[in-house]
Every structure is written in C-alpha cells, then in structure tokens.
Regions:
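Canonical SH2 domain fold
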Residues: 65-66, 72-80, 85-93, 98
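Short, well-ordered helical secondary-structure segments
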Residues: 41, 45, 63, 98-100
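N-terminal "first-domain core" detector
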Residues: 1-43
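Polybasic, proline/glycine-rich intrinsically disordered low-complexity segments
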Residues: 13, 20, 29, 85-141
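A contiguous binding-surface segment within folded domains or other stable secondary-structure elements
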Residues: 36-56
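Short, surface-exposed beta-edge/turn micro-motifs
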Residues: 32-35, 71-75
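Short linear interaction motifs
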Residues: 50-70
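Generic secondary-structure microfeatures
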Residues: 41, 58, 80-82
Length: 141
C-alpha cells in the first residue's frame, strides 16, 4: 500500500469544537506553502497549489462549513496534528453518510489537504456498488 493511502487510513484527531476548527484553518492559512489540495469531486492533483490558491480555497471551505453545517459542534474536520498538520480531511456537510459512522461504505472526505502527493481515493474506496437486495446485503453476494 502507498504511503498516501496509509496516511489516509491512519490515525486522525477529530476537531469537535468550532474554536479548534477555526484555529486549525487559520494555522493552514498562515502556513500555505507546499500543500496538495485534493477536492475528491475532481482528479487527484499532481502538483502543489500556490499559497494564494491554497488560502483562497481554505476560505471557501471555511464558508461552506460555517454556512452549511448548522451544528453546535464541528466534527467533520480531521487532522493528523493540530499544531503542525501535514494531512487534513474535511467532509462536506451535505455528504456525511450515516450519522453513526458505522456504515459499510463510509463517506469520502470532499477535501484532502496533504504535504505528500495524493492518490485517487475515489478509485480506491469509491462509491459503493448498487445494493443487490435484502438477502445479498447480509450474505455479501
């Protein structure tokens, strides 16, 4: 398995409080160099984005989070390190899957920010196949 996929599936810190989320996003804005910005609705990038593009996108993501995630808590941002992040997963508020987090095919984060070149996580973990029926689900047919 690749180091990117290993990192993607590794341990992350869930950012629960809005205050912590804002601090993380500000930290990213203040350290905008050498980031790969992967919007999983598009192809995985092969180059890092400029600092200007990175900051612009973080601000857009911040707007989406604050306008569309009307909760008292954040809970949809994950990072490998709060102080010196090198990998951040951000889920779109309108694509959270099952709220209990135990679905067979958990949702893919929409935005993946990393210091290492990304791989196509949609190809690797992509959308689930169509369900075949009640019995098939339990028998894994």
């Amino acid at each position: 398995m690749s180091s990117y996929i290993d990192k993607f599936q590794g341990r992350f810190i869930g950012v629960m409080q809005w205050e912590d989320c804002n601090a993380l996003l500000e930290n990213l804005i203040n350290n905008p160099d050498d980031w790969y910005l992967y919007d999983t609705l598009t192809q995985a990038p092969t180059t890092t984005v400029t600092a200007e593009v990175f900051v612009e996108n973080i601000n857009k993501i911040k707007t989406v989070l604050t306008e569309e995630h009307q909760e008292r808590y954040c809970g949809i941002v994950y990072t490998d390190d709060l102080k010196t992040p090198s990998f951040v997963k951000i889920f779109h508020p309108n694509n959270l899957g099952k709220t209990c987090g135990s679905s067979e095919h958990p949702p893919i984060p929409q935005w993946l920010l990393s210091k290492i070149p990304p791989e196509d996580v949609i190809e690797k973990f992509g959308p689930p196949e169509e369900e075949k029926g009640f019995v098939s689900k339990f028998l894994k047919l």
